[in-house]
C-alpha cells in the first residue's frame, strides 16, 4: 500500500464507523484456518464453533505465516476460501513484511518509483483491524464486478444507459439519478474505485499525466483519483450523518 494513499484512507475510518457491517468469515474460511493452524488437534468442528465471531481468538490465528504458505501451495486452496479471507491474510502478510523494512516504494505523478520512508506508518495503519477489514472487503468487492442497463425518466423523456460498478463516471452519473437515500453507498463505491485504481494500478494511471490532455478529455491522473477518493469518502460520511 503506497503511503500517499493514506490521504484517501484517512476517511475510511469515519465511514466504517457509520457503516459497520458484520464482516464474517464463512464456514469454509474457518475450516481452512483451523486445519492450518490447529494441526495438533483433531476436533476441528469444535474449534470452529469456538472461534466463530470471536475476534480475540481469530486475530492470533490469522497472524500465522503458515496460512500464506498453504494458500499458495496448491491452486485449489485459493478457491476454498472467500476473497475476503484471502485478502485479510495477504494484508497481514504485507504488514509483517513491512515491519522489516524502513521504506516503501511510492509511484510519483510522473510514474517514477521513489523510496519513501513511511513503512512504519503503513504498518501501523494495517495494524488497525477496522482499517484492515475495510481494505480486505474493498479488495474482495473487485473480484467480481457488476454491470447492467438502467432506464429512467427525466424531464419528460426516457433515457437508457449502461453502467459498470468499476467505472467512476458511471457511478457518478448513477448517483445523480437515484434516490437520495441510496447515494452514500454509491459515493463509497466511487471512493473505493479511486482507492483501488490509485493503490493497485498507479503505474497505469500515471501514464495519463505524461500525455497532452485536451480540455475535452475525461482521462484522470493519479492525483485526480487520490483527490476524488478522499472527497467522496468525506461526502459519503457527511450525507449519512445528515440522514440520521
Mark where each language-model region is.
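Polar/charged low-complexity regulatory segments
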Residues: 2-244
Amino acid at each position: 500500500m503506497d503511503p500517499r494513499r493514506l490521504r484517501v484512507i484517512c476517511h475510511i475510518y469515519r465511514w466504517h464507523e457509520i457503516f459497520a457491517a458484520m464482516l464474517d468469515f464463512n464456514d469454509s474460511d474457518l475450516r481452512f484456518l483451523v486445519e492450518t493452524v490447529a494441526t495438533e488437534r483433531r476436533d476441528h468442528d469444535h474449534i470452529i464453533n469456538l472461534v466463530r465471531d470471536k475476534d480475540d481468538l481469530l486475530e492470533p490465528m490469522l497472524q500465522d505465516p503458515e496460512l500464506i504458505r498453504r494458500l499458495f501451495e496448491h491452486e485449489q486452496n485459493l478457491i476454498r476460501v472467500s476473497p475476503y479471507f484471502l485478502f485479510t491474510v495477504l494484508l497481514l502478510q504485507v504488514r509483517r513484511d513491512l515491519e522489516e523494512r524502513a521504506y516503501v516504494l511510492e509511484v510519483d505523478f510522473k510514474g517514477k518509483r521513489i523510496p519513501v520512508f513511511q513503512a512504519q506508518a503503513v504498518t501501523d495503519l494495517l495494524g488497525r483491524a477496522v482499517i484492515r477489514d475495510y481494505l480486505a472487503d474493498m479488495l474482495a468487492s473487485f473480484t467480481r464486478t457488476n454491470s447492467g442497463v438502467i432506464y429512467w425518466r427525466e424531464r419528460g423523456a426516457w433515457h437508457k444507459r449502461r453502467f459498470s460498478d468499476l467505472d467512476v463516471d458511471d457511478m457518478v452519473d448513477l448517483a445523480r439519478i437515484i434516490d437520495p437515500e441510496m447515494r452514500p453507498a454509491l459515493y463509497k463505491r466511487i471512493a473505493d474505485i479511486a482507492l483501488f485504481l490509485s493503490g493497485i494500478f498507479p503505474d497505469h494511471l500515471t501514464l495519463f499525466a505524461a500525455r497532452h490532455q485536451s480540455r475535452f478529455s475525461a482521462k484522470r491522473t493519479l492525483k485526480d483519483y487520490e483527490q476524488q477518493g478522499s472527497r467522496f469518502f468525506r461526502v459519503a460520511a457527511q450525507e449519512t450523518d445528515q440522514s440520521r
